[in-house]
């Protein structure tokens, strides 16, 4: 998979700016987890072992956008849990895209067809679908 030219330019510009400012350490990707809850219980994922108080917590749209603003990274990965479970995931993504953040929404895709209407096509948004190998191995790993 190639990287779109506009993304190369934006990220390259960000890296150059950090270098010119003399910064040796700076964020490149914000790992934003608006929730830990998932619609699967994969054996390899430690999230299922968290107490319900954590699994039931949801970041608000404003908390997510504030975190992105504070971090300043040009890229935001939204893993989970399963982000498509979040009731406001469409607004979270729209707010990040409006800030010209490159958003990678990581999903197991079980809800993707049902939730796809929440997302407006954008060169700043892509979906990363999690698979654990070919069908037989994947189905065993996530069941």
Language model segments and positions:
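Conserved alpha-helical substructure of the radical SAM core
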Residues: 2-118, 122-123
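Conserved radical SAM core fold
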Residues: 83-85, 109-114, 129-143
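Broad gene-expression machinery/nucleic-acid interaction feature
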Residues: 126
């Amino acid at each position: 998979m190639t990287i779109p030219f506009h993304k190369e330019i934006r990220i390259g510009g960000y890296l150059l700016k950090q270098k010119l400012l003399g910064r040796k350490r700076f964020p490149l990707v914000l790992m934003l987890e608006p929730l830990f809850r998932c619609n699967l219980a994969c054996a390899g994922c430690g999230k299922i072992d968290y107490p319900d108080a954590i699994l039931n917590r949801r970041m608000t749209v404003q908390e997510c956008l504030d975190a992105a603003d504070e971090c300043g990274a040009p890229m935001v990965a939204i893993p989970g849990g399963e982000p498509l479970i979040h009731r406001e995931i469409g607004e979270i993504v729209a707010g990040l895209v409006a800030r010209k953040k490159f958003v990678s929404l990581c999903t197991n895709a079980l809800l993707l067809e049902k939730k796809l209407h929440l997302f407006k096509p954008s060169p700043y948004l892509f979906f990363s679908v999690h698979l654990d190998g070919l069908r037989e191995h994947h189905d065993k790993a996530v069941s």
